[in-house]
Amino acid sequence: MTVTVLFELRIKPDAVPAARDLMHRPLEVTRAFDGNLGIEVLVDADDEAHWMMYQLWDTVEHDEAYRSFRAGEGKVTELPPLLAAPPVKTRYVTSDI
């Protein structure tokens, strides 16, 4: 069953250009990761430092494997200093409603 993940980032306002430059490569890796069905980065129209990453995964297990990868060998170590707050991840399962 597919799952949708919303991953919210609050970037330090003065770090937005650096975050934009940084995220190109990690997003390429995410898009190529096994089980990823798509990812879009949404930027708040009123606050360019507020980003929402909309991710679609084939299964919960694919999402979990990706999270493990990002916590280990795929960690984006340059990102935390650019953040104004810790990221917030919310996972949704697709229902039959």
Task: List the predicted regions and their residue ranges.
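An amphipathic, aromatic/His-enriched active-site/gating alpha helix that lines ligand/cofactor pockets
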Residues: 25-37, 56-89
